[in-house]
Amino acid sequence: MKNIAVLGSTGSIGTQTLDVVRGHRELFHISVLAANSSDELLEQQIREFEPELAVLSDEAAYARLKSRYTGKTQLAGGRQAFIDAAAYPAVDTVVTSMMGFAGLEPTMKALDAKKNIALANKETLVVAGEIVMRRAKEQGVSILPVDSEHCAFFQCLQGEKRETIEKLLLTCSGGPFRGKKREALIGATKAQVLAHPTWNMGQKITVDSASLVNKGLEVIEAKWLYGVDYDQIQVVVHPQSIIHSMVQFCDGSIIAQLGCPDMKLPIQYALTYPTRQSSDFERLDFWKLKDLTFEKPDTDTFKGLRFAYEAGKMGGSMPCIFNAANEVAVGAFLKGAIHFLDIYDIIEQTMMKRACILEPTLEELFEEDAWARAYAASLLEK
């Protein structure tokens, strides 16, 4: 029986993680549930899964829940309580399914407590990949990717040596605007941006998918997870989202991982590894597959991917700057404060304004994140 902590349990990945647990109650026990502010949904989850601890980062939401709930689960509130939940003693594996830079502190806390990580919070590796991977190695714990693409790489590389990797072929649906040029995106609405053709996800990651920033974040994540150079990571647009990613080896062979687009599959793989367990997930029917097509990404129109490669190759603190500027810009877009294409301008201007720290400490990364957010926010006022 694995004891699981789900950080971000009320979000898209968190709720799908609980779906996986429902299908294998003989394998998993939910010890900790933690969310930001969705107190009503968290209360439902508490009553169903009966964890030892439940946390709400938002103090007002915590107060609301505390006034209603009278069960056995211990409740805690506030940002520090959320971070501390990652190190809960009884937990074996921590699912980090919260969004953005806010995932870094809880992930580091979990690593310091020698917890295995099922990583859905890609920003942790984007911002502090070298530090995080080194800490995991020092602590002797595993970081198992929950992203469908990185889970695909992980499976393709089973039994293979890292030095035999020639290229990681990172697939990308292309998002709702695939094939469109910049002129067609000038008046893109929030509804259009959030209409992803394949995946049902939270709003922030859906915007990132439309801008291809999400694919850029995954490029940087792949660099740290698999120890390859950026020139070895190639993004391939694959609209059907059936091939989740591929690895090309030094002899020219390519191994691909295929499956129906369902996030529960990589979630279950991460939770059950090193074994595979049965599931009732949809099966791929090759007789019904009409075609599998591939395209080169348009990085002139979708500049977020190009900026990610540039930030990654600069290294140091620049991916942190890139990520922070994007988080501010996406937040502003979702509030209707800027246009979709303004996201790229804010990222570019913020990256150009700041010198790169080549070997930043964790403390310096927090400072750089704060600076980038403040500067990006100042651009919104112009």
Per-region residue spans from a language model:
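Catalytic, metal-anchored helix/loop core of enzyme active sites in primary metabolism
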Residues: M1-K382
